Amino acid sequence: MDTFKQISGRIAPMLEPNIDTDVIMPKQFLKGIDRQGLDKGVFFDRRFMAGGQPNPDFILNMPGWQSATFLLVGPNFGCGSSREHAVWGLKQLGVRGLIGSTFAGIFDDNCQRNGILTVSLDEPALARLAQLAASADTNSITVSLDRCEITTAEETISFVISELKRAMLAVGEDAIAWTLQYLPEIENFEVAHYSRRPWLKRPASPLG
């Protein structure tokens, strides 16, 4: 997983509420688990027209917002079914951060596991950011995870994130990798636990 410390890039506004995972990654792109080529599926029904040509009216196809690093999203972004393909696709498309008011819980967790930062801001801050994101002349921002700040052309906006989430994103580790650093302590606890309560330990299976 890629690290996230300080990243600069353009932010694209997608402020519609309740954009669900079926919109982010349509079902026809869920067939594999190898994570290959999922960037093509992101917002497929909006990015492309019936004949497969790019939709010129979709924000991520417009010159000032192509290859956007951040998305400014509406409330309850990522709702719907739990499909990690949606997050994999966003990451492959180059999205490193989502800024909004609220995110669906499972989707938010999937972003955390895959190196995409989610930031929740209050409505006044989102409104100011939306005004800047709407113009290609002012839609460049810098997000510092170390300082928990978003720097725009006009101001610096502070945000709050849990220390555990910040630390894991900063070093590029998911929950499994983060837990493995405590393996010696876990093993020591297990030995001590079963030495005091041996009746809790399951006998070895005869099948190995």
Curated annotation (Swiss-Prot):
PANTHER family: 3-ISOPROPYLMALATE DEHYDRATASE SMALL SUBUNIT (PTHR43345:SF5), 3-ISOPROPYLMALATE DEHYDRATASE SMALL SUBUNIT 2-RELATED-RELATED (PTHR43345)
Cellular component annotations (GO), alphabetically ordered: 3-isopropylmalate dehydratase complex
GO BP field: L-leucine biosynthetic process
UniProt name for this protein: 3-isopropylmalate dehydratase small subunit 2
Disulfide bond residue pairs: none
Keyword RNA-binding: no
Record keyword rRNA-binding present: no
Pathway in which this enzyme or protein is active: Amino-acid biosynthesis; L-leucine biosynthesis; L-leucine from 3-methyl-2-oxobutanoate: step 2/4
EC number: 4.2.1.33
Reactions accelerated catalytically: (2R,3S)-3-isopropylmalate = (2S)-2-isopropylmalate
Function: Catalyzes the isomerization between 2-isopropylmalate and 3-isopropylmalate, via the formation of 2-isopropylmaleate.
Family from the record: Belongs to the LeuD family. LeuD type 1 subfamily.
InterPro entries listed in its UniProt record: 3-IsopropMal_deHydase_ssu, Aconitase/3IPM_dehydase_swvl, AconitaseA/IPMdHydase_ssu_swvl, IPMI_Swivel, LeuD
GO terms assigned for molecular function: 3-isopropylmalate dehydratase activity
Phylogenetic lineage: Bacteria, Pseudomonadati, Pseudomonadota, Gammaproteobacteria, Enterobacterales
Subunit structure and binding partners: Heterodimer of LeuC and LeuD.
Pfam families named in the record: Aconitase_C
Alphabetical UniProt keywords: Amino-acid biosynthesis, Branched-chain amino acid biosynthesis, Leucine biosynthesis, Lyase
Gene: leuD2
